[in-house]
């Protein structure tokens, strides 16, 4: 794909984030995305066969951004607990910074039918697997006691999902206020001492975006 084509495709996706996050999936029409992106219907259909494919592409885009950020954050770090901490922190930061995408991923993709549910479950499995891998590393390094990391990873996903969905709907609590107690609760749940949690990288200042 040429650079020009990539720019056009990204413009369409960025426009779709705004339209879907404001109107919802069912109320959004392809014409709305065409208008918001300042492209043409032909251009939109050249890259995406329909509204469903645009929506699924946005879910993939959010998942890719999230995973790339997590990998970039933890790669320079050898400490297992710190890697878990950074992965969790980046996850919450990304949801906060890409609120429109988070709304699409966590809220609107629920209950839209089998295709969307399959995609959503695939991504839950993908990120539960990432969390599990970092917990396994912490166990291998002797930093936490052996636990069933698969079960814990899905429990963590559930906790993160609930607090972020509330934030997406209400804007509360503020991201910085959300991260610190949630991180402490999750890390204590796998046996990380309070004193060790206090030594971890501090919560950064987070700027929320609409897309």
Where are these regions (language model features)?
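N-terminal intrinsically disordered/low-complexity leader segments
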Residues: 1-7, 147, 196-211
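Amphipathic, non-transmembrane alpha-helical scaffold segments
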Residues: 5, 13, 59, 63, ...
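Helix-turn-helix
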Residues: 11, 19-53, 57
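Amphipathic alpha-helical packing segments from all-alpha helical-bundle domains
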Residues: 67, 71, 115-140, 150-154, ...
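Generic hydrophobic, amphipathic alpha-helix propensity
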Residues: 8-16, 33, 54, 58-66, ...
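Hydrophobic alpha-helical connector segments
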Residues: 57, 71-100, 152-156, 176-179, ...
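Amphipathic alpha-helical segments used for helix-helix packing
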Residues: 96-115, 132-133, 165-169, 199-201
């Amino acid at each position: 794909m040429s650079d020009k084509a990539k720019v056009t495709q990204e413009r369409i996706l960025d426009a779709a984030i705004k339209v879907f996050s404001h109107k919802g999936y069912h109320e959004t029409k392809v014409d709305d995305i065409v208008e918001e992106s300042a492209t043409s219907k032909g251009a939109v259909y050249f890259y995406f066969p329909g509204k469903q494919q645009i929506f699924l592409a946005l879910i993939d885009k959010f998942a890719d951004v999230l995973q790339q950020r997590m990998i970039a954050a933890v790669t320079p770090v050898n400490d297992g607990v710190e890697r878990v901490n950074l992965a969790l922190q980046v996850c919450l930061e990304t949801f906060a910074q890409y609120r429109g995408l988070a709304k699409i991923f966590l809220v609107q993709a629920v209950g839209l039918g089998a295709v969307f549910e399959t995609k959503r479950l695939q991504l839950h499995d993908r990120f539960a697997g990432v969390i599990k891998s970092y917990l396994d590393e912490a166990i291998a390094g002797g930093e936490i006691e052996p636990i069933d990391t698969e079960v814990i990873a899905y429990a963590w996903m559930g906790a993160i999902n609930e607090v972020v969905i509330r934030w997406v709907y209400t804007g509360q609590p503020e991201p910085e206020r959300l991260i610190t107690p949630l991180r402490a609760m999750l890390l204590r749940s796998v046996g990380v001492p309070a004193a060790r949690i206090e030594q971890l990288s501090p919560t950064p200042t987070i700027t929320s975006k609409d897309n």
